[in-house]
Amino acid sequence: MPPSISAFQAAYIGIEVLIALVSVPGNVLVIWAVKVNQALRDATFCFIVSLAVADVAVGALVIPLAILINIGPETYFHTCLMVACPVLILTQSSILALLAIAVDRYLRVKIPLRYKAVVTPRRAAVAIAGCWILSLVVGLTPMFGWNNLREVQRAWAANGSVGEPVIKCEFEKVISMEYMVYFNFFVWVLPPLLLMVLIYLEVFYLIRRQLSKKASASSGDPHKYYGKELKIAKSLALILFLFALSWLPLHILNCVTLFCPSCQKPSILVYTAIFLTHGNSAMNPIVYAFRIHKFRVTFLKIWNDHFRCRPAPAGDGDEDLPEEKPND
């Protein structure tokens, strides 16, 4: 270990590595499950795959870059900016994937009979591509000029230096807090989160109303359908809650930095907020395993088929996976 790394930094790196070691395999397992189980091929699970891809990238790319920034190497301004932007792209992709999931669940309970005609695989693919393109635009905005280059250049010139500034690479040194608060948080994080809360409230209202009507009419299949929708909606709302719980503290700290520059932010608070944002990428597979039956069964099948030391018992083949049913 290089002598320049303090004990505190070593602890930080250790926690980040642990998060990555949970996040990457867990989300790869989610993608694998959707690939092997035909019952996990509807639009919702395609959006979940998009979310899992972003979470894999957090563990495989963002966390190593965060460790690099924490060590604080000296580099050119735009090189540091390129290191800082991936987390913005992936965060935005996660938010838009969660929004797409919420809209998809709303359509499933609002227009159940027309759902498959409206939400086609092609449209779902277009929506996913649109989410990623928009995420790239939002996340790369600092590369287009909304950054701290002018301030850094002034300090660089004041020291009599010429050429592109060489700085100690830190997130707040290159990313403008005006961008993070006014554009990223107030436009692309907070409004989508509030919209998703409203959508899930409407979803729960529609499901409760349908369950009440169907129960009173003693209907079988519709009651079962909306019961399943309620269970899945609760699980996905939990994913949304965990995302908000993980990301809002860091955005609130950014607001403090912008609106109260003289306010001191305890290092432990900042690092806790960072750990929450990265740790969120490891939470989703755990929620899927405990809350969504199709995922749990498929995870067990993958484990039995590929990782157990002894052969899986007969009958653990594809026939044991949950079968896809209309509107299931």
Swiss-Prot record:
One of its GO terms (cellular component) is dendritic spine. Receptor for adenosine. The activity of this receptor is mediated by G proteins which inhibit adenylyl cyclase. GO terms for molecular function: G protein-coupled adenosine receptor activity. Disulfide bonds join C80-C169. The keyword Transmembrane applies. Keywords: Cell membrane, Disulfide bond, G-protein coupled receptor, Glycoprotein, Lipoprotein, Membrane, Palmitate, Receptor, Transducer, Transmembrane, Transmembrane helix. A lipid is attached at C309 (S-palmitoyl cysteine). Residues 1-10, 70-80, 147-176, 260-267 are extracellular. This is Adenosine receptor A1. Residues 34-46, 103-123, 202-235, 293-328 are cytoplasmic. Belongs to the G-protein coupled receptor 1 family. Its main location: membrane. Pfam families: 7tm_1 (PF00001). It is found in: Cell membrane. It is a multi-pass membrane protein. Glycans are attached at N159. SMART domains: 7TM_GPCR_Srsx. The chain crosses the membrane at residues 11-33, 47-69, 81-102, 124-146, 177-201, 236-259, 268-292. It comes from Oryctolagus cuniculus.
